[in-house]
Amino acid sequence: MDGQLSLLSPTSSSSTSHSRKRLTKKQRPPSANHRTSSSFNVESLRIDAQSLDSKRSASSLRQGPNCNQSPSLARTVSVPVSVPSNAPAHTKASDLSLPRSHTTRSQSANRPYNPTQTIPTNRFILSPASSSQPQTQSPPYPSAVASTTVTSSRNKDTSKQYDPLDSCIGSFDQNKLSTDELIGAPFDGNAILSRIEATKLSAAPAPTSTTTIAHSNNISPRRVAPPPPPPPPALSRSNTDSKAARSSKPSKSPKSTISNKTMGASSFRHSASFSSAEQLPPSEKPSKSESSSSSNKRHSGDGKESRVPGMLRKKSGFSGFMNSLVGSPKKPLISAPENPVHVTHVGYDSNTGQFTGLPKEWQRLISESGITEKDRREHPQILVDVLTFYKETTEKPQEDQQLEKFHDARATDFRSPPVTGTAPLVLQTGVGYAHGPMSPMISPPASPRFPQVGHEGSFENPRAPPPVPKGPGPLPAKDINLIPSRPAPKPPAISTRPLVPPASLPAKDSGIGMPPPGDEAPMPYLPPKDNVQHMYQEEHRNRSRSNSRTNGAAPFSPVQASPLHPIATANQTAAYQQQLLQHQQEQAMAQAQAAMSGQLSRAASKRQQPTPPTSQHQHPRQPDINGAPRMPQTQGAAPQASARPRHRPRQSNAIDVVASLKRICSDGDPREIYRGFTKIGQGASGGVYTGHERGSNRLVAIKQMNLEQQPKKDLIINEILVMKESSHPNIVNFIDSYLCAGELWVVMEYMEGGSLTDVVTFNIMTEGQIASVCRETLRGLQHLHSKGVIHRDIKSDNILLSMEGNIKLTDFGFCATINEAQSKRTTMVGTPYWMAPEVVTRKEYGRKVDIWSLGIMAIEMIEGEPPYLTESPLRALWLIATNGTPHIKDEQSLSPVFRDFLYFALKVDPEKRASAHDLLRHDFMNKCVDLSTLAPLVRAAREARAQEKARKGQ
């Protein structure tokens, strides 16, 4: 056979070539002898090919000799052959007389015959198919007549080979080996035929295939045998024979009745080498699950094909499932958003120098403002700040702007002892400033060290400036409307923060000049006034959150440790004071908590202001949003307030305001007390009249307001309290107030001379006269600052003169429209020509904003108008923010001392700016003249105004 295997007869070679598609031919190792089977016919080939297709072909080998129920098993031809157990290792199959028997329906293994070494009958080679499975051993079998078996389990892994294992030949009756155990056993025709013959003669019932299968299923033959050394490559035997034997099941195939001769030939032909099994892909090898069912028979060549469709189906199903999860193109469509709202976001493109996302209104303002593109590129942030400020000021009602002026305008007295109480620290209004009245009204918490929570502008720095006075409300007929419509910057006063101890307050307010010792001694508020202020401030704070324009944190006058001075009104306001203080404290705490959580708007913080410690037992007072100094309440009141942090419902504000007004207003009807009402102005919620007091015939100014039409009732209370506490020769005095038939009547001192605006418009003033006006104004500011009040609207329109030349500050909200002379500038709502740069740019500010305004007013007295008055309001704001100190047209004509005075008053940096106390000591004050010298100017201005009105009347 010379290295080639002749398995098939010439007549059958053609038919088997297409059945067995994976025939392999191997070179015979030199030492290997061949076993062949010679007799074979076409019929046996067909049977063999079909049996190979059976997945259970491996089970027929063992069943063959035992299944006597099959007719094919009964017909066997046995040729006894004597094979000694110690036969030579090399013996040709042809030398042995091998019986041929048809043992099974088909013992097919369509594999080429591969040469193998002949080994003793009691030693066998483990087939690759079963090499990976544990093997069992059986006791030795009688040498010549033993049936050759190997206890091995099929395994799909055919890549490994093992050396021959000692396998004892056992009786099928004694050791019922499983079907899988016969896989890969070397084919020994002699032993098989001998066993079949013995079975036939004995006529003993053999176990059925069912029993055998059960045995194989119940008794696991997979015992791990010690791994033998690797065998020679040539000594590998295919399990084809055993598979072919197992594949035949007599009861299921009619072809099991073929002749013995044919079956015998088939059996011998299939005792091929094991090498073919190695070459089979794992997918073509029958598995145990496959061997359990013979109904689904597949050919060796189309085994894979039968699986592929199922696998593809599974894969496609799984892929479809994954696609549905990950990103299938069949996604549900999402509808477009409904009722979308586009929020404009203004940005700046540094490449093009253009703003993006500007609202149309802002674009129009910029185009009409006269601000060049170059300027916009150089200061983009300032432009945004100015636009925001301008929009806020122009959109607020004038009345609101007027009334919010003193909101939260108090600063803490840094010199006062720290509060010892545990209640939340509330700065008290009227507290003297450590820096003196000139120091800004910034409340200590507002100072850089104590960021204000919820303060307007707090996003920029801890104590953002309170909004500029909101809109120039119906200010006095004068230009009060020029007051920036934006709520006056909230006093630096921060919402009361229980966590900030008075001691922790900054030693100085930002931008506050150091006052000369004792210069600005804190002025204690009278208890009744403070209490009233507390009520009013509380009310004001509730409503001024968003639009209150604080006049700056009013410095809180320190409540002296000594008992407060009793006041006649103390009894009247004591009960209200306690109630108001508690309510304010609750609001302050709630606001502080909300601010810490980012819930409060910056405007809300404007209203809140810590009160300075009033005494050793200082009761934390809520910041008077209105800026009116508050009376420190008993310690008991403070803890109570802290216990109830929540604000009262906003709905109750109107009721609270009315109740508060009743407590602070006098009883009676003003129409019975005053006579001769003459209307001189009109505000948003009422008119301004002059009248004479019955009996004394004193001329007074009366403002009548309808509370139902007043949007900021709490601000009204604040203004009343501020004026009550601000009795000073240089401040328009508050006389009385009445609440009658739902209308509030406020009676104030009337200044017949009109405003300084008329004087500077129709007259040229000397430096001495200018110095006198500045001195009187500084004195009034010093007093306000000592009370913790920032006026924030110092300008010629709010400086009133008497016919004798006396000068007083006005516009505490109620005097806004008293002077009809201001009607000229009423249309210029919110144009802050006198405002400090820090206010325009929405930065933190303090009491020194009033000093800047005083310097601008000095220029106004020199030139007859403030700088940039001829510019558009928006451009004026832009120039104030970018130019800083304005340019004086004829500066060289001024004396050096006057220029020096202006230099310190108009410092852009509030820290370097002089305070009211500093300027009162400036050498320029030496040039002051007697106030009586102003009387002629006042009369001349009145005459000129009358003539102008007469011309207009014609």
Curated annotation (Swiss-Prot):
Keyword Cytoplasm found: yes
Residue stretches of biased makeup (Basic residues): 18-28
All copies of domain Protein kinase, residue ranges: 674-925
Keywords: ATP-binding, Cytoplasm, Kinase, Nucleotide-binding, Nucleus, Pheromone response, Serine/threonine-protein kinase, Transferase
EC number: 2.7.11.1
Domain of life: Eukaryota
GO cellular component, one term: nucleus
All residue ranges annotated as the CRIB domain in the record: 334-347
Biased composition (Polar residues): 33-42, 57-75, 100-121
PROSITE patterns according to UniProt: CRIB, PROTEIN_KINASE_ATP, PROTEIN_KINASE_DOM, PROTEIN_KINASE_ST
Pfam families membership: PBD (PF00786), Pkinase (PF00069)
UniProt feature, compositional bias: Pro residues: 224-234, 463-475, 514-527
Active site residues per record: D793 (proton acceptor)
Catalytic activity entry: L-seryl-[protein] + ATP = O-phospho-L-seryl-[protein] + ADP + H(+); L-threonyl-[protein] + ATP = O-phospho-L-threonyl-[protein] + ADP + H(+)
SUPFAM superfamilies according to UniProt: Protein kinase-like (PK-like)
Annotated GO biological process: bipolar cellular bud site selection; budding cell apical bud growth; cellular response to hydrogen peroxide; cellular response to starvation; intracellular signal transduction; invasive growth in response to glucose limitation; negative regulation of gene expression; negative regulation of sterol import
Function of the protein: MAP4K component of the MAPK pathway required for the mating pheromone response and the regulation of cell polarity and cell cycle. Phosphorylates histone H2B to form H2BS10ph.
PANTHER family in UniProt: SERINE/THREONINE-PROTEIN KINASE SAMKA-RELATED-RELATED, SERINE_THREONINE-PROTEIN KINASE SAMKA-RELATED
Protein name (Swiss-Prot/TrEMBL): Serine/threonine-protein kinase ste20
Species of provenance: Neurospora crassa (strain ATCC 24698 / 74-OR23-1A / CBS 708.71 / DSM 1257 / FGSC 987)
Gene name for this UniProt entry: stk-4
